Each structure stands twice: as C-alpha cells, then as structure tokens.
Amino acid sequence: MTQYEKAGITSTRRILAKKIKLLRYSRGWSQETLAELCGFHRSYIANIESGKHNVSLDNLERIAQAFEVPIAELLNPDFSLRIEQPAAAYFLDTAYG
C-alpha cells in the first residue's frame, strides 16, 4: 500500500500531485515560484503536491495557466515530459525511475 492509499487519496489527486511536481521540477521552479505565479501561498502548493487538497476548477485553471498547459495535461496519467535542465532530469529519474 502506497502513502497515498494509506491516506485515502484518490488516484486522480495522486496523478495531479505528481504531475504538478513533475512540471514544477522540469522548469526548475520552487514551490514558492509556482505559488507566486498562481497567486497562492507556498503551503497550498505543498498540500496539493502531497495530495492533501482537493483543488477547485478555478485553482486548477490558474495552475495550468502558470505552466502554460491545458488543464487536461494536469490530469493526464502520462508522465513523459521532455526535460531540458540536467538537474531536473536527474531528480526526476531518481524520484520516478
């Protein structure tokens, strides 16, 4: 059983959490940077990434706009992204294998 399953987090929230973290790392952004771009507090981003928050459609739209991706991309279980920054690529390879 994964940490998400133990916490009762749905698969959609798990996908969203991982996708936001993946997109954020691929751009070399901190949680603070993403939060500022969306008009959120850093702890809100942290809670989304840990799967603790249900995200409203309005907030999902703000996150998608910050990443310049369609909302559907945030919920897409395909995690293949082109990573340009070596440090981000190393982290993602280590974290997601």
Describe the residue ranges of each PLM region.
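A short, Lys/Arg-rich alpha-helix, primarily the initiator
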Residues: 2-26
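Short, charged recognition helix plus adjacent turn
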Residues: 1-10, 75-97
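Conserved hydrophobic/aromatic packing and binding residues within compact polymer-binding modules
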Residues: 20, 34-35, 45-48, 74
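Recognition helix of helix-turn-helix/homeodomain-like DNA-binding domains
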Residues: 39-55, 79
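Short basic helix-loop element that most often maps to the first helix and adjoining turn
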Residues: 18-37, 62, 89, 95-97
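DNA major-groove recognition helix of helix-turn-helix/homeodomain DNA-binding modules
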Residues: 58-73
